[in-house]
Amino acid sequence: MSITAERKSALIKEYATVEGDTGSPEVQVAILTERINNLTEHFKDHKKDNHSRRGLLTMVSSRRSLLDYLKKKDEGRYSKLITSLGIRR
């Protein structure tokens, strides 16, 4: 259900703006998107897991805030990120 360390490292390497970058909005959104996708798969089998659903809603809200920030700062990076992650907006 959670992301493996290898997958997280791959996401960081793919979306980092500079070497060793783990805090940029792109990296944070990519990691949150991976966690959200894992949880949506979890809910296909466990429909009544409302405790995890609350965590999912928190993650979606956090991702939305980061995307709004990125759109305000640099719209080019924002549009590139949502197309590469397949997020609709």
Swiss-Prot record:
Q: How does it assemble?
A: Part of the 30S ribosomal subunit. Forms a bridge to the 50S subunit in the 70S ribosome, contacting the 23S rRNA.
PROSITE patterns associated with the record = RIBOSOMAL_S15 (PS00362)
Instruction: Extract the SUPFAM superfamilies matched here.
Output: S15/NS1 RNA-binding domain (SSF47060)
This protein's UniProt keywords: Ribonucleoprotein, Ribosomal protein, RNA-binding, rRNA-binding
Signal peptide (residue range): none
GO process terms (BP): translation
Aminoacyl-tRNA synthetase listed as a keyword: no
NCBIfam families assigned:
S15_bact (TIGR00952)
Q: Which GO terms describe its molecular function?
A: rRNA binding; structural constituent of ribosome
Q: List the disulfide bonds.
A: none
Q: What does this protein do?
A: One of the primary rRNA binding proteins, it binds directly to 16S rRNA where it helps nucleate assembly of the platform of the 30S subunit by binding and bridging several RNA helices of the 16S rRNA.
- Domain of life assignment: Bacteria
Q: Which InterPro entries match?
A: Ribosomal_uS15, Ribosomal_uS15_bac-type, uS15_NS1_RNA-bd_sf
Instruction: Enumerate the SMART domains for this protein.
Output: Ribosomal_S15 (SM01387)
Name of the protein in question: Small ribosomal subunit protein uS15
What are the leading ranks of the lineage? Bacteria, Pseudomonadati, Pseudomonadota, Alphaproteobacteria, Hyphomicrobiales
Q: Which GO terms describe its cellular component?
A: cytosolic small ribosomal subunit
Q: Does the keyword Ribonucleoprotein apply?
A: yes
Name the protein family. Belongs to the universal ribosomal protein uS15 family.
Query: HAMAP family under this entry?
Result: Ribosomal_uS15_B
Which positions are tagged coiled coil? none
